[in-house]
Amino acid sequence: MKVLIIPDVHLKPFMFKQAAELMERGIAKRAVCLMDIPDDWDKQFDISLYEETYDAAISFAKKYPDTAWCYGNHDLSYVWHVPETGYSTMAAYTVQKKLLDLKEVLPESNPIKYAHRIDNVLFSHAGISKDFVDLYVPKIKHDDVDTVLNYINNLGKMKMWYDGSPIWLRPQYTDVKMYKSQQFLQVVGHTPMETITKKKNVISCDVFSTYRDGKPIGTEEFLLLDTITWDYSMVNYGNY
């Protein structure tokens, strides 16, 4: 299946508009969003931008209800009341309400999760390590991927809010062993990259994030992935 991945958003409503137009052109059958919808440099008081971004996400969710949504650390900081870099106390109510609005438009069978699986590809905000699975999933269950994801998706703040979890891991800069690294590809965001990059069985695609002055860190391209063959390409909206 061809899948279009929307990486970390961070108050960029245009990402959903561009992704919607690409989907309309038939570029992919399904979309995945790695979230981190709120927060960006020095935007804590721009409540209208928070509203606009969530409204764009909700509009996209209505149009493409089978989109897989993966919680990011910035999303959960408002759910769990744990201030994060860029956290806006002014926008907290707006984020909480709009996140509920987003949840309400999603099908009951397709809620926001920490991790989703499509064919032999695992999608999460930051990545699922073998150590994390060893820590929180009974060993006898490790070969049943859907059961492993079910265990993970039912964990709470105490187990998820730390550096090794699927909302915080940074496999780009360490030699951490990933879960089922020979059998499954993982697609992650979280760590800003200059370009969409594959390292072993992990594709990192957070290429829309910016420096504090607003200059893009990455190429601002979407990842287009075949979940069967693992073939992938980078899609620049302006050139497609």
Task: Cite the ranges covered by each PLM segment.
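Short hydrophobic beta-strand that contains or immediately precedes a catalytic carboxylate
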Residues: I5-I6, Y71, F123-S124, V188, ...
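Active-site environment of divalent metal-dependent phosphoester hydrolases
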Residues: H10-M15, D39-D42, H74-H81, S129-D131, ...
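Conserved beta-sheet core of the metallophosphoesterase superfamily
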Residues: Q172-V235
